[in-house]
Amino acid sequence: MENFKRRKVQVLAVVLVAMLAALVALGIYFGQTAPRNLYPTEVRDYQGQNLSSIADVRENAIKGTQFLNTSTYRLTVTGLVNRTVEYTYDQILSKFQSYQKIVTIFCVEGWSAKILWQGFLVNDLLNDVGVNTSAVGVIFHASDGYSTELPLSYLRDNNILVAYKMNGLTIPPERGFPFELVAESQYGYKWIKWITQIELTDNPDYLGFWESRGYPNNATIR
C-alpha cells in the first residue's frame, strides 16, 4: 500500500513538471512574454497627427552614443558674439522659453520620422549673447567631434529649435541628449546631436564632418 502511494506521488510530480514545461513552451511559442517597450509613455498622436516612434529615429553617430552628465555639461556660445557664454543644462531649460512643433527628419539613407520636438529657439539664444554684424554662419560642435554649419539667416528666419524633448520625453542618449538641432527642411546630417558648442562665424564655407567628406554644404531638401 505504501509503495502504491509513493508511486502515485511520483507520477503526479512527473505530470506536474510536464505540464509546467508545456505551459512555458506554449508561452514562448505564442509570444506571451511581450517585448519591453523602450519608450512606453511617448506621445504618438498630437493635434490629430500620427507621430513616428522615437525608436524609428536611427542612431547614426561617428563614435557611437555619447553619454553626457548634466552636472558637468556646458553649452558654450562663442565666436563672433558680444560675449562668450557657458550655459549649464538647467540654465538652458529655465532661462529660455520652451516651444513645441512637429518636424519630420529625412535621412540621406532613405528613412524618415515625424516627431514632436520640444526645445528652445536658436534665435533666443543668439539674442541673449548678442551677435556681431559680421557673422553670417553658425557652426555647431558635438562632444564626439562632429560639426556642421548652417546660415545664420536660415536659423533666424525659420524659428529653428534646439530640442531637449521628443514625443514628450527627454531625448535619450542614443538620440542626442542633452540637445539636438532640429534642422527642419535639411537632411539628417545637419541635425547635429550632443551639442556642446555653438560658434558664430563670418565664413559661409566652413565644412563640417560629412561636408568635408563630400556631402553638399547646402542640405536643403528639394
Feature-to-residue mapping (PLM):
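Extended, aromatic/histidine-rich regions of cofactor-dependent oxidoreductases associated
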Residues: 2-75, 128-222
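N-terminal post-signal-peptidase region of extra-cytosolic proteins
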Residues: 56-63, 91, 108, 119
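A glycine-rich, hydrophobic loop/mini-helix early in the fold
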Residues: 65-113
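Stable alpha-helical elements in mature extracytoplasmic
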Residues: 73, 85-88, 118-121, 125, ...
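Mid-length scaffold segments of soluble, non-membrane domains
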Residues: 97-150
